[in-house]
């Protein structure tokens, strides 16, 4: 693990006394980020749906950073006005914001696109539009500060390889990937290029709510491992923060992604990895 002093030297945005805003902060990766950044001396704004989990998370982070350095804001990221209000609260309480982690998301499976319009809309409103709302609300003021800043949007490997099973989730995370790529390009063309965007791509991560599991599966990483890897990647200047886990190392992910883009290049059927006519070819490709 990289020492905090080395991280903060490489990334002034994460310096002591600076402010991080984290959505989806009441549990999982978001809460792990809040605790880790609090240990680094940052002020923390935790945003999540209001309730006991957010209250508990706020107390846990305040035990590290102190009550005066923590602000909890009940916020539904699917609603632009609530994210605007979150930004007003964050800037009002702490002045500048130097890190925005758009991490809130849900893993609901609304099924086929032709039988559950409301379910699809809810998932996309949270997973995709929630990130757009965060960027809209915070970016202008982060740019105006003329200070170093970071925006980290949480995507998913499912937004890249798009496996069958939860099409709506895949669509939402594919949108996050494309949006964040374009955001990074736009920001690096701003005068001074002091604000950058990055795509966090977690692997199999145990959050305490993972598929109903009460104990961490052997193949999963913890949220804390994801955040340590994220910080190491940011120090390197990575845009794609492609996290491994205890089941899938990076070379395995790379081959799966290469096969997915190969569907276009080789003119194979969509999602050929799961097509019976290409099952053997995929297996041979993975072994090669």
What are these regions (language model features)?
Residues 51-52, 74-85, 117:
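The beta1-alpha1 cofactor-binding region of Rossmann-like NAD(H)/NADP(H)-dependent oxidoreductases
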Residues 84, 107-121, 165:
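Conserved mid-core segment of classical short-chain dehydrogenase/reductases
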Residues 135, 172:
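Active-site helix of classical SDR
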Residues 40-57:
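Conserved glycine-rich Rossmann-like NAD(P)H-binding loop of the short-chain dehydrogenase/reductase
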Residues 19, 26-28:
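Conserved glycine-rich cofactor-binding loop
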